[in-house]
Amino acid sequence: MNYLVIYPGRFHPFHQGHMASYDWLTKQFGENNVYIASSNVQDPETSPFEFGDKVKMATKLGVPASHVVNVKNPYQATEITSMLSDEEKANTALIFAVSAKDAERFNFAPKKDGSPGYLQPVPDNKKDMKPMTKHGYVAITPTVNFRVKGADANSASQIRKLYRDGNGNDRLAIITDLYGTPDPELKAVFDQRLGVNEPAEGIIYGQEAVFAGDNPVSVMREDRAHKLQENIEFMRKKLRALREKQDYIEEHRPRKK
């Protein structure tokens, strides 16, 4: 029996915890049989990264680019399963890999007639697995904590918060902790997607400079700039609180069965 393993997820961002799951799956089912499935759906707060960004992150950690697939629905991933011929499907076991947190997405209840549903947990003995024409299977990957800025981390939302709240040195350290090196390309991606490189203050000062032509106006500009800076910081705090609230809602939203 051959294996086709699909590791679905949002991956905003793809991090060392995800890579640990990928490595575990390759040891269980073979490196050539494991595919990461993710979509290009974006949301500025909870899903900020493009699919191409995720490919950069995953390949930086060692996943072959050909094994990171853009799909419409990661938890079906028909773009991957359709790569097999009917003959291959009849001799291939299909496995979806999820963390314990996401396992509730899957329902192992029997059909109305009492027969087993299509999706089943991976059996203790892999020799008992049926081909994907009869059943699909769900493997629950171990949860792995990793260190970011000297503290344990295990979620993408936690990483996004740390990055947004940090300064330039903090953000470079986070990139190094996540990907092994202070990769400038990945840092630029994070800065852009997480909205931490907006030159708001520079734009405001530039506009003021255009209209300030003499000393009295320059003195007034300095006072206005101080108040504007206070307003900017206030709005940043409000935006940060909103982002944290949206991350909390996303993580605790009931999943469809």
What are these regions (language model features)?
Residues 196-223, 229-236, 241-244, 250-251:
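Glycine-biased, low-complexity coil/linker segments
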Residues 249-257:
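Long, low-complexity, intrinsically disordered segments
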Residues 1-213, 234, 256:
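Nucleotidyltransferase catalytic core that binds NTPs
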